[in-house]
Curated annotation (Swiss-Prot):
Protein name: Protein translocase subunit SecA
NCBIfam families recorded: secA
Gene that this sequence comes from: secA
Function: Part of the Sec protein translocase complex. Interacts with the SecYEG preprotein conducting channel. Has a central role in coupling the hydrolysis of ATP to the transfer of proteins into and across the cell membrane, serving as an ATP-driven molecular motor driving the stepwise translocation of polypeptide chains across the membrane.
Biological process, per Gene Ontology: intracellular protein transmembrane transport; protein import; protein targeting; protein transport by the Sec complex
Reactions the enzyme catalyzes: ATP + H2O + cellular proteinSide 1 = ADP + phosphate + cellular proteinSide 2
Organism, scientific name: Mycoplasma pneumoniae (strain ATCC 29342 / M129 / Subtype 1) (Mycoplasmoides pneumoniae)
Disulfide bonds, paired cysteine numbers: none
Length: 808
């Protein structure tokens, strides 16, 4: 064996592919055995595999060959499709928790079914994650027909599904769900007050379809469940008006990060406008934050790119796919800044009740895998963040698609005229054309150009998403012209109509290079599926966003030189490739930075959610309450240390505080603590409060005490966790500005977040102990009621007496 072949085998990617290929060969060897079995016998074989895995300590990898061969035969009997060897290879890669890169049209959907079945033998649940509800429901319907033949159940989870139906969906062996609804269900599960109200039974194994779209593109925006907060309508409007009046020399926008900032002139203008001497003073932090948000909304964001306005609502558009991110809104007041800019209703800024990033969420699974047609360029990120090796799977048939060199134009206007001319030329031959645009504005601009040229066409973007499947399905027919805002995650193959292959197949025309080569490859991948003929070409201008943001200096000179000419240039292609790699590195660093910060909160969230589950599941809370009591008593007594002698306590003040806050009248007096050291006082206080709580349990009865105490503990934890999230987000936002010491902002954030977390735990303990101590027992309640009634009678007698005196 040569050195090169040896290195290929020891490389994780090649080693995994080599193993998967070997498995596929073995599966092929079982073909005749399963072909000769009846449907009933196939079901019996499936049940035997379940028993081996669940009762006899076999792993799914031990039975993978038999299971894949069995499900391959079942698929054939149900659909008439016999899984290709490359689909078996892909299924094995998915099964072991890695990323199978399979080109468009290579049968990723069936590959997922094969892998899902094998993992479902564990009976612990498989979550198949898709990018939208249409795909989830479509794929769940098709999978049900196959998997029910081998005794497996299939569920589908989507928004607005009744709670009991969600539980039923997640109780199935395989559950199809959208990524956003799955994440929100996880957050909502950790807000329930009864464990039996949870929807998701376990985060065991997830297969993410269009994995790069979900795990990278959407990972930049965290999932957030919000609650209403105060409405600062006037403040948003005032700041919006101020920002709209700013002159060009009063603000600046970094061309690469697109981060806005005020110049010195802008700062002086702001201080004069808002009547303050120092915009950066601590008391002005909220004002400064609102100004930066308004700058982002007014000077950076564009309607049709970052968001659209529909029916008076600001809806976020996925930068990469052109889809609306349903149920998502910008956080920390940015959404309100955009609403003020667009002069629509400004909703109250919400308080974050629960939040998680996709990176943190999907890493909670015992095993995570993914499939996509475009992942290889982000191999490093998938390995470092998700511990998945990206393994390219060869196409079933050779790829004969022709990828033409880019045509480069000096300005966008010249480019668009050339695009229309090219579309007209191709359309006259009857060959179908798919045109990819970078954003909604460009798709509508091209729509207007084609209308003027009398070229019939369809437009697929966030404004027309309801007809997505219908439009994509027809895009390969003779004469079809389809404009699409990015094709990432569209999920429906473009099949060539009769006679189209003879014309050269689908012609894909990109009108702008994206920030990521991966997104460009997704568009190219729509042509030439399963060995079909196809052709792709990009028309780009030096005024496109990618050049303007990341190569602006060199481009200014090139535009002057190029003028109105056009040419296919290896120089520009190389510069473009370098620019894309640079942007990919910047975006990776941004996501990595998000993960570094989120990791701190993720570990705290894990601790809180685990503790919350313990509260919900416990049949005896006494140990947990005692730990809280210990934390509470030390902190409570610490407030009353004698300033002259830290080992002594001001026993009079301590006694009064305990009687006032914990209702310890008749139990505690200053004499109890006379001449006691601090440690002895803590021990005595702990004993007295513990005794009071024990007596409450006896009077209430243990079952009732369990219910009442649990509710107090859950409510206190939720209240202070929400408060903690708000504090952490404010800390994160300002930590860079506040970091004046010789240490990184991340280290400052880690240290101060830990302080906030410990403070939160103390607040939870304090609330729980005080509320339990003040919880009225039936006797105390009756006694208080008698006192209240006596006071009412006394008051009535006084009023009657006063009236009789007035009458005399």
């Amino acid at each position: 064996m040569g050195l090169f072949n040896f290195l290929k085998l020891v490389s994780p990617r090649h080693r995994i592919y080599h193993k998967a290929s070997k498995i596929a060969n073995e599966v092929e060897g079982h073909k005749n055995y399963y072909r000769n079995l009846t449907d009933v016998q196939l079901l019996e074989e499936s049940n035997k595999l379940v028993d081996l895995v669940t009762k006899q300590n076999y792993t799914i990898l031990d039975v993978a060959v038999a299971a894949l061969a069995l499900i391959r035969e079942v698929v054939y009997r149900e659909t008439g499709e016999f899984a290709y060897r490359v689909q078996i290879i892909g299924a094995y890669i998915v099964l072991i928790g890695d990323f199978a890169e399979m080109m468009t049209g290579e049968g990723k959907t069936l590959t997922i079914v094969l892998a899902a079945y094998v993992s479902a033998l564990e009976k612990r649940g498989v979550h198949v994650v898709t990018v939208n509800e249409y795909l989830a429901q479509r794929d769940a319907t098709n999978a049900t027909k196959i998997l029910k033949r081998v005794g497996m159940t299939v569920g589908c989870n989507f928004a607005n599904l009744a709670p009991h139906l969600k539980q039923a969906a997640f109780a199935c062996d395989v559950t199809y769900t959208t990524n956003s609804e799955l994440g929100f269900d996880y957050l909502r599960d950790n807000m329930v007050h009864r464990f039996e109200d949870k929807k998701i039974r376990e985060l065991h194994f997830a297969i993410v379809d269009e994995g790069d779209s979900v795990l990278i593109d959407e990972a930049r925006t965290p999932l957030i469940i919000s609650g209403p907060a105060k409405n600062e309508f006037a403040a948003y409007v005032a700041v919006d008006r101020f920002v709209k009046k700013l002159k060009e020399d009063e603000y600046k926008i970094d061309p690469e990060s697109r981060a806005p900032a005020l110049t010195e002139l802008g700062i002086k203008h702001a201080e004069k406008n808002f009547k303050t001497d120092n915009l950066f003073a601590l008391e002005n932090s909220d004002l400064f934050h609102k100004i930066i948000n308004a700058l982002t909304a007014v000077k950076v964001f564009e309607q049709g790119k970052e968001y659209i306005v529909r029916d008076g609502k600001v809806l976020i558009v996925d930068h990469f796919t052109g889809r609306i991110l349903e149920g998502r809104s910008y956080s920390n007041g940015l959404h309100q800044a955009v609403q003020a800019k667009e002069m629509v209703e400004i909703e109250p800024e919400n308080v974050i009740v629960a939040t998680i990033t996709y990176q943190s969420f999907f890493r909670l699974y015992n095993r995570l895998s993914a499939v996509s047609g475009t992942a290889f360029t982000e191999s490093e990120e998938f390995l470092k963040i998700y511990n998945m090796v990206v393994v390219p799977v060869p196409t079933n048939r050779p790829n004969i698609r022709k990828d033409r060199a880019d045509s480069v134009f000096g300005t966008p206007n010249i480019k668009w005229l050339a695009v229309v001319k090219e579309v007209k030329r191709i359309h006259e031959t009857g060959r179908p054309i798919l045109i990819g645009t970078a954003n909604i504005d460009d798709s509508e601009l091209l729509h207007n150009y084609l209308q003027e040229a009398n070229i019939p066409h369809e437009v697929l973007n966030a404004k027309n998403h309801s007809r997505e499947a219908e439009i994509v399905a027809k895009a390969g027919q003779k004469g079809a012209v389809t404009i699409s805002t990015n094709m990432a995650g569209r999920g429906t193959d473009i099949r060539l109509g009769e006679g189209v292959a003879e014309m050269g197949g689908l012609y894909v025309l990109g009108t702008e290079r994206n920030e990521s080569r991966r997104i460009d490859n997704q568009l190219r991948g729509r042509a030439g599926r399963q060995g079909d003929r196809g052709e792709t070409k990009f028309f780009i201008s030096l005024g496109d966003a990618l050049f303007k943001r990341f190569a602006h200096d060199r481009i200014e000179r090139a535009i002057t030189k190029l003028g109105n000419d056009t040419f296919d240039s290896s120089f520009f292609s190389k510069m473009l490739s370098r620019t894309q790699k640079r942007v990919e590195a910047i975006n990776f660093d941004t996501r990595k930075n998000l993960i570094d910060y989120d990791h701190v909160l993720a570990s705290q969230r894990e601790l809180i959610y685990k503790q919350r589950d313990k509260f919900l599941l416990a049949t005896d809370l006494s140990d947990m309450i005692d730990k809280m009591l210990e934390k509470f008593v030390e902190q409570f007594c610490d407030q009353y240390r004698n300033p002259k002698n830290q080992n002594l306590v001001n026993h009079i003040a301590l006694s009064e505080a305990l009687n006032l806050e914990l209702n310890m009248h008749g139990v505690i007096s200053p004499k109890l603590f006379e001449n006691m050291t601090f440690d002895a006082t803590v021990h005595k206080t702990h004993s007295l409060i513990g005794e009071k709580i024990t007596n409450k349990v006896k009077v209430l009865t243990p079952p009732i005490a369990l219910i009442r105490f649990r509710e107090i503990m859950i409510t206190a934890m939720d209240k202070h966790w929400i408060e903690h999230l708000d504090n952490v987000f404010k800390l994160r936002e300002g930590v860079t500005l506040r970091s004046m010491e010789q240490t990184s902002p991340l280290n400052v954030y880690i240290r101060e977040t830990d302080i906030l977390f410990q403070t939160m735990l103390q607040k939870i303990a304090r609330d729980v102990i005080i509320q339990i101590a003040n919880l009225a027992t039936p006797e105390e309640f009756d006694e208080e009621l008698m006192k209240a009634n006596a006071l009412k009678k006394l008051q009535a007698l006084r009023e009657a007496h006063e009236k009789s005196n007035e009458g005399q």
